């Protein structure tokens, strides 16, 4: 859980904004949403495999664009 120490003479709004930003970077909300319901192990494996395929396709697309610019 991210924590934020409020500095002297720091407005509450600024501290709250820093806390929200640290929660976003840590992925707290996405983790909570993901754990709201039970996900079967097969569904977890399927989701991770689909994410890996998507990452690989994205990587290939970036490489192709890079080589296109060279010519």
UniProtKB/Swiss-Prot annotation:
GO terms for biological process: translation. GO terms for molecular function: structural constituent of ribosome. Pfam families: Ribosomal_S21. It comes from the Bacteria. PROSITE patterns: RIBOSOMAL_S21 (PS01181). InterPro entries: Ribosomal_bS21 (IPR001911), Ribosomal_bS21_CS (IPR018278), Ribosomal_bS21_sf (IPR038380). Keywords: Ribonucleoprotein, Ribosomal protein. GO terms for cellular component: ribonucleoprotein complex; ribosome. Gene3D superfamilies: Ribosomal protein S8. Belongs to the bacterial ribosomal protein bS21 family. This is Small ribosomal subunit protein bS21. It comes from Chromohalobacter salexigens (strain ATCC BAA-138 / DSM 3043 / CIP 106854 / NCIMB 13768 / 1H11). The lineage of its organism: Bacteria, Pseudomonadati, Pseudomonadota, Gammaproteobacteria, Oceanospirillales.
């Amino acid at each position: 859980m991210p924590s934020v120490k409020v500095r002297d003479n720091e407005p509450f709004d600024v501290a709250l904004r820093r806390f929200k930003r640290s929660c976003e970077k840590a992925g707290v909300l996405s983790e909570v949403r993901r754990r709201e319901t039970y996900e079967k192990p097969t569904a977890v494996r399927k989701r991770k495999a689909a994410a890996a395929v998507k990452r690989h396709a994205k990587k290939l697309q970036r490489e192709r664009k890079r080589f296109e610019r060279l010519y």
